[in-house]
Amino acid sequence: MSDSQMVIDLDVQVAVEGFELPSQAELELWVKTALRDTMSEAELTIRIVDVEESQELNMTYRGKDKPTNVLSFPFEAPPGIELPLLGDLVICAAVVEQEAIDQNKPLLAHWAHMVVHGCLHLLGYDHIEDVEAEEMESLETQLIESLGYINPYKEQ
């Protein structure tokens, strides 16, 4: 399915100030790219947060007392009910910005990577086991490169 045929209902919530953030159009493009081979219609929320909210959510849901770049909260519909609701992504602007600096990556490219990475988690991909990590990283690389950015796992 082409990106233009896909219907995305993207709710963007910005709960942080003072950061260079991607536009709604950029976020939608990245979501469509991540989902293009799997869904024709999707609803999701991207919430962009500060360090405190990210750390609190990471502690509550993952038991890690530190902020993180992206958290994924997939929606699971009850059996027999089909909804296009994919779930929620929570992205910490400060962590994304610092990682881009530390990894010597363009900020927009790193934002694209985090959105694609989070969407793949919403689709059920994971990187806990090595085999899963290789599969997920390979797919992420293909998707990110299709957007015109370089391999996010290549050393800069």
UniProtKB/Swiss-Prot annotation:
Q: Which GO terms describe its biological process?
A: rRNA processing
What does the entry's cofactor note say about binding and number?
Binds 1 zinc ion.
Molecular-function annotations in GO: metalloendopeptidase activity; RNA endonuclease activity; zinc ion binding
**What cofactor does this protein call for?**
Zn(2+)
Q: Where in the cell does this protein reside?
A: Cytoplasm
**Ligand binding (Zn(2+)):** 117, 121, 127
One GO term describing the cellular component: cytoplasm
Disulphides: none
Keyword entries, A-Z: Cytoplasm, Endonuclease, Hydrolase, Metal-binding, Nuclease, Ribosome biogenesis, rRNA processing, Zinc
- Chief subcellular site? cytoplasm
E.C. numbers: 3.1.-.-
| Task performed by this protein | Single strand-specific metallo-endoribonuclease involved in late-stage 70S ribosome quality control and in maturation of the 3' terminus of the 16S rRNA.
Q: What NCBIfam families has UniProt attached to this entry?
A: rRNA maturation RNase YbeY
Family note: Belongs to the endoribonuclease YbeY family.
What's the protein called, per UniProt?
Endoribonuclease YbeY
The taxonomy runs: Bacteria, Pseudomonadati, Pseudomonadota, Gammaproteobacteria, Alteromonadales
Q: Which gene encodes it?
A: ybeY
